[in-house]
UniProtKB/Swiss-Prot annotation:
Keywords annotated in UniProt: Biotin, Cell membrane, Glycoprotein, Ion transport, Membrane, Sodium, Sodium transport, Symport, Transmembrane, Transmembrane helix, Transport
Region (Disordered): 606-627
Cellular compartments annotated: Cell membrane; Apical cell membrane
Taxonomy, superkingdom: Eukaryota
Annotated organism of origin: Oryctolagus cuniculus
Annotated Gene Ontology cellular component terms: apical plasma membrane; plasma membrane
Protein name: Sodium-dependent multivitamin transporter
Sugar attachment sites: N489, N498
Amino acid sequence: MSVGETTSAPPTPAPDSDVITSTFSLVDYVVFSLLLVFSLAIGLYHACRGWGKHTVGQLLLADRRMGCLPVALSLLATFQSAVAILGVPSEIYRFGTQYWFLGCCYFLGLLIPAHVFIPVFYRLHLTSAYEYLELRFNKVVRICGTVTFIFQMVIYMGVVLYAPSLALNAVTGFDLWLSVLTLGIVCTIYTALGGLKAVIWTDVFQTLVMFLGQLAVIIVGSAKVGGLGRVWDVASQHGLISGIELDPDPFVRHTFWTLAFGGVFMMLSLYGVNQAQVQRYLSSRTEKAAVLSCYAVFPCQQVALSMGCLIGLVMFAYYQEYPMSTQQSQAASDQFVLYFVMDLLKGLPGLPGLFVACLFSGSLSTISSAFNSLATVTMEDLIRPWFPECSEAQAIMLSRSLAFGYGLLCLGMAYISSQMGPVLQAAISIFGMVGGPLLGLFCLGMFFPCANPPGAIVGLLAGLIMAFWIGIGSIVTSMGSGLAPSPPNGSSFSLPSNLTIATVTTLMPSTSLSKPTGLQRLYSLSYLWYSAHNSTTVIVVGLIVSLLTGGMRGRPPNPRTIYPVLPKLLALLPLSWQKRLHCTSHCQDLPVDTELFPEKMRNGALRASGDKEPMTEASPVHQGTSPTFILHETSL
């Protein structure tokens, strides 16, 4: 079956008399309320525990003492948004299981951050990922990266709060602004008062709720249609089970190559350089714990993706046996799954409430991460560098005030989203357009020692211009033809680089159209290649400008900010080849300069020498200007 096609016809709608009236029972309201109560209680507990003794490090980085498992679940929850929970099943229902191959990109998409980005960030003892840009380039590049990230996340958090609330209101009659205000206020309170530790532990709780809610739908739905075997048989009979589509054309929406390799760049923009994720790595007790938490996300992501796909298959099998109402058949894609769940779980008190709790757990986890990361970068990148004399107490109060301020801004953005109408789709897509250029900026600095500040700035601007040109062009072209666009840099499971793009992607038609030409051909580039395209633009333009402006002009970059790509690749060769290439001739005899990795506080300030972290084997250390890199490991 080719991508975007399905051999099955939609089930015949039932008469209008069968329209579903989805109402919550008292038990459902209790289950949903417990989610809010427990989330708030976790935040207040961490806020009250040690009140008056908190430090900025505790508030923003959980005092760098978090374990592997909570960090891993928080990494998963951060971009497992509510719209993703609605978007994946709808994608599978409409287009088949081709989307499941996105799971193939998770391996490289998490392996590279674990062994490239985490070691560099962790050993620099950063608080903000954008502090790296100042250490590698200069303060101007740091501010450019920070402002770009703030723009991305401010749009993201308003839409991720409003969109699922709107879908829930349309299906269940749940008051729209009551749910928006309740979620926004609860999330703001526990994030601002409890800091990152509260956010991580509420993410753990909310992740469990998300899994339970989806599992309930799978169990009840498969039982009603005769079991998972029957679900699979029905899907196979109707051509919903997709084979591997090996078409290399990057303009085809979903193929194996697009999902498995284009998705890698999307994952890198999320799990490699996004502040919300980097902050969690840096909160780990040790570098090893940070790496293990990144590994642990892999099976969790596979489970989350598989559950979403299963719900889509169960939904398809269910509607082959039970006719849907006209109201359901005409529903928007972000409402379609909710109609199915309310139809499926009616008469089972508590389960509709559990799924709604699952849905809003996705919203809470993503919004709280946005608040916390925005407060962190604003404090560390825009305020502290200009007010270094700010006391600890003032910094704590300011950090909490920033989180509260971003919470109010989130509510304002939710209101603006409600007024945007069709433009909302463009606002959603902006999040995905920004992820690729930011990834390219970090890769430019980390992998290319010749890159200089002018190259970084011009490269970032070129990447953003290219991203918005193609992304907005795709939206306008699709609107002009009456079709939903293929959103940039999105995927149904994670939205940062995708957000509610998951919902938008499912609106694509199931029939092939004539091939576009000219600029329309460029605008039809698969959204999963956007991160790769835009990050490559930043790197290529950045390198050209850097070379034209003289590179680093004899001022080599700080070796701690460069990832030694060539020595790492040479290390993969057989030992005999390494000896012939003379890449191991003297690496065992050089001394380790522990001063190259002093423990650094915020904004480049160094701790007293007595507080430095001891060095043992394992960390990649560049010995002065020598081209040789030696492996050492910090005792973390």
